[in-house]
């Protein structure tokens, strides 16, 4: 099971909510969500691997996840997205029908926070689309005029593309003839 849960506590912050509700005209068009800080839950098999990481710009995190999803759908060998402060990055590497997740903190000393997690590619893509749709719905609940913002329009377009994208067939892992096989055993001889 895999789920992305964009934080929603920002909606209860009077500063964010009143500022968003008052946006109009050119300010709506220029809205990019950069001031909205919240957490992003990343749930793998019932465990939130991002628990305790902290708040970061929510719209930026969701945007980067959607872009990473588009890169993977286009056959890129890897993608990454900011998922927390520091920055904390989620690295995504296709492995057949799955995607290998590694979460790293680049705050010195850089370290791996979670790794070796395989997630079904289609579930990952659905979770990315769902997270983006939830953030847009929450924004529009506060100010429906935000529908006209460049950011919301671009993200909506990207979500449509991601949800419809035919995934480029993933290469088998490890690639045939790879000298990187290291710890990958194809068979065990007795």
Regions found by a protein language model. Give the residues of each.
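Low-complexity, intrinsically disordered tandem-repeat tracts enriched in small/polar residues
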Residues: 184-189
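Generic structural signal for well-ordered, non-transmembrane alpha-helical segments
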Residues: 63, 97-100, 126-133
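Compact, well-ordered interaction domains used in eukaryotic information-processing assemblies
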Residues: 52-84
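Charged/polar positions within long, soluble alpha-helices
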Residues: 70, 74, 104, 137-140
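An exposed acidic His-Trp-rich patch
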Residues: 76-124
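Mixed-charge, glycine-accented linear interaction segment located at domain edges/termini
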Residues: 110-176
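N-terminal low-complexity, intrinsically disordered segments
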Residues: 1-60
């Amino acid at each position: 099971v895999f789920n992305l849960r964009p934080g929603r506590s920002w909606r209860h912050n009077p500063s964010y909510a009143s500022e968003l509700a008052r946006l109009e005209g050119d300010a709506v068009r220029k809205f990019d969500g950069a001031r909205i800080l919240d957490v992003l839950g990343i749930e793998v098999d019932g465990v939130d691997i991002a628990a305790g990481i902290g708040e970061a710009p929510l719209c930026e995190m969701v945007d980067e996840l959607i872009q990473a999803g588009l890169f993977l759908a286009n056959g890129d060998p890897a993608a990454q997205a900011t998922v927390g402060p520091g920055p904390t990055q989620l690295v995504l590497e296709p492995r057949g029908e799955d995607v290998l997740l590694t979460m790293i903190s680049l705050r010195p000393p850089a370290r791996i926070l979670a790794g070796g997690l395989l997630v079904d590619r289609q579930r990952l893509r659905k979770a990315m689309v769902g997270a983006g749709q939830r953030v847009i719905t929450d924004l529009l609940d506060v100010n429906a005029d935000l529908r006209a913002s460049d950011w919301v329009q671009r993200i909506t377009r990207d979500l449509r593309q991601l949800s419809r994208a035919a995934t480029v067939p993933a290469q088998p892992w490890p690639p045939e003839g790879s000298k990187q096989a290291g710890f990958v055993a194809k068979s065990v001889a007795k």
